[in-house]
A protein has these predicted regions:
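Acidic/glycine-enriched connector segments
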Residues: 1-167
Length: 169
């Protein structure tokens, strides 16, 4: 990977009425990253945010050929299943590189993938609804621990932790 690197994390289950807003915000963050000198973009190729990010980066690559997209796939069978879908296979073929984190599935494989992306990135774009659990929340916490730049795109109604919720009678 050459140049500065940016990756994405976000939810798979997004409110349908927010998808256009999310895509617009992602496009803005990708454009801002490119303006800031980022040339390498990484995606875990999951459904939802990851796929939108891939499409948007590849659109921009048509006018800015120096941009590179790296697919970071958690395990080999996941890559095999992605390659069975024509559109996803085309997206993978457009990548500068495909990194497979490990050969076999283990419950921790998605955390390992997310960790790899953060460790190899200078900036992380997070599409996040405030949930304290799940892969996106863990990736955001890891981003903070690694002292990497984080750009958050809020989604829907932010879910407050219990201790911050207003008390009801």
């Amino acid at each position: 990977m050459k140049g500065k690197t940016c990756c994405v994390t976000g939810h798979r289950d997004l409110p349908q009425n927010e998808i256009n807003k999310i895509k617009t915000a992602l496009a803005h963050e990708i454009d801002a990253a490119a303006t800031d000198g980022f040339t390498c973009f990484m995606s875990g190729f999951a459904d939802g945010v990851d796929q939108y990010f891939v499409e948007l980066v590849l659109e921009r690559k048509q006018t800015t050929p120096a941009l590179e997209l790296i697919a970071v796939i958690p395990y080999r069978k996941r890559l095999d299943s992605l390659n069975k879908k024509t559109r996803t296979r085309e997206l993978l073929e457009a990548c500068a590189d495909v990194v497979v984190i490990q050969e076999k599935y283990l419950p921790s494989v998605y955390s390992h993938r997310n960790r790899y992306m953060v460790e190899h990135s200078d900036r992380v774009i997070a599409v996040y609804d405030g949930r304290e659990t799940g892969g996106t929340a863990k990736t955001i916490r890891f981003t903070h621990r690694m002292k990497k730049e984080l750009r958050e795109i809020p989604v829907g109604e932010i879910v407050l932790p219990d201790h911050l919720k207003p008390k009801t009678k």
